[in-house]
């Protein structure tokens, strides 16, 4: 949770500053990307929410970010710890014509792109660990989860979920903060 301290005679304050995601600012920074970007305060899973929106008729492509996931997940059903306003939880959905053979190398491509993006902002040593993790100094900083919906031989949607540990709290169990998987 979020630590709040009582300041006698003044009220309350957060234990540390908090910067929330801003869809407008993110859209401005992604100039030239015509895809709708939505930020939610809390979802069970950004990938699961994208599938619900597809089922409700929202057309791909679009981007969904969340401040928190209550049931974040990784490959093979692993839990992805997703506390509020500490890390980045993002999913993107793309329509794929021609079936899943069109996206065979997508997980690798996304992993390399995440590692390169982290390096570009000064996170030295970010490297891809096959098939879907990005590590820094042997510690997992990012995970990628791809899921498909539709006809795997024809028209389908691929949902690309990316979680990046930005400000993982010290009270998160050490096995989650530092485990190399």
Over which residues does each language-model region extend?
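Alpha/beta catalytic cores of group-transfer enzymes, especially the acyltransferase/condensing modules
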Residues: 128-132
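N-terminal lobe of the biotin/lipoate ligase/transferase fold
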Residues: 2-120
């Amino acid at each position: 949770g979020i630590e709040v301290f009582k300041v006698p005679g003044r009220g309350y304050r957060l234990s540390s500053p908090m910067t929330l995601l801003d869809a407008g600012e993110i859209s401005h920074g992604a100039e030239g990307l015509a895809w709708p970007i939505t930020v939610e305060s809390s979802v069970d899973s950004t990938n699961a929410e994208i599938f619900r929106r597809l089922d409700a008729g929202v057309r791909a492509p679009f981007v969904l970010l969340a401040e928190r996931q209550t049931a974040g997940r990784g490959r093979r059903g692993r839990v992805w710890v997703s506390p509020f306003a500490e890390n980045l939880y993002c999913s993107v959905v793309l329509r794929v014509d021609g079936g899943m053979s069109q996206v065979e190398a997508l997980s690798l491509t996304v992993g390399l792109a995440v590692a390169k993006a982290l390096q570009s902002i000064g996170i030295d040593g970010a490297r891809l660990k096959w098939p879907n993790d990005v590590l820094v100094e042997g510690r997992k900083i990012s995970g990628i989860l791809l899921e498909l919906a539709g006809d795997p031989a024809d028209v389908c949607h691929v949902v690309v979920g990316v979680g990046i540990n930005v400000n993982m709290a010290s009270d998160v169990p050490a096995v989650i903060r530092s485990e190399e998987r």
